[in-house]
Swiss-Prot record:
It comes from Lysinibacillus sphaericus. The lineage of its organism: Bacteria, Bacillati, Bacillota, Bacilli, Bacillales. PANTHER family: ANTI-SIGMA FACTOR ANTAGONIST TM_1081-RELATED (PTHR33495:SF2), ANTI-SIGMA FACTOR ANTAGONIST TM_1081-RELATED-RELATED (PTHR33495). The keyword Electron transport does not apply. GO terms for molecular function: anti-sigma factor antagonist activity; antisigma factor binding. SUPFAM superfamilies: SpoIIaa-like. This is Anti-sigma F factor antagonist. InterPro entries: Anti-sigma_ant, Anti-sigma_F_ant, STAS_dom, STAS_dom_sf. Belongs to the anti-sigma-factor antagonist family. The gene is spoIIAA.
Length: 117
């Protein structure tokens, strides 16, 4: 499991996940993301799932937990480009409304309120 965390604006972080996300990798990712949220600047997380090949229930818990943390700052979450299998998992978990098929740039523009077309 490999991941990248990039602050694209003062309020928005993009998390790129690669490989397999299981309970072994979740703790490291959770600590970094929660630290950014609790510093008080992050209000939006864009999870780029394009490079993710597998995620178990601990990965869903990771996303749900960060969504709860963001609720305290009226934050938002975007689940970007999940695979067909992960799309089903997110839909069954009630996370369907947060999914988006787009580029990172389009997701960032949506967060900023810029809508093209």
């Amino acid at each position: 499991m490999h991941f990248q965390l990039e602050m694209v604006t003062r309020e928005t972080v993009v998390i790129r996940l690669f490989g397999e996300l299981d309970h072994h990798a979740v703790e490291q990712i959770r600590a970094k993301i929660s630290a950014a949220i609790f510093q008080g600047t992050v209000t939006t997380i864009i999870w780029n799932l394009e490079g993710l090949s597998f995620m178990d229930s601990s990965g869903v818990g990771l996303v749900l937990g960060r969504m709860r943390e963001l609720e305290a700052v009226a934050g938002r979450t975007i689940l970007l480009n999940p695979s067909p299998t992960m799309r089903k998992v997110f839909q069954f978990s009630g996370l369907g409304p947060w999914m988006m098929d787009a580029t990172e740039e389009q997701a960032i523009d949506r967060v900023r309120g810029i809508v093209n077309g």
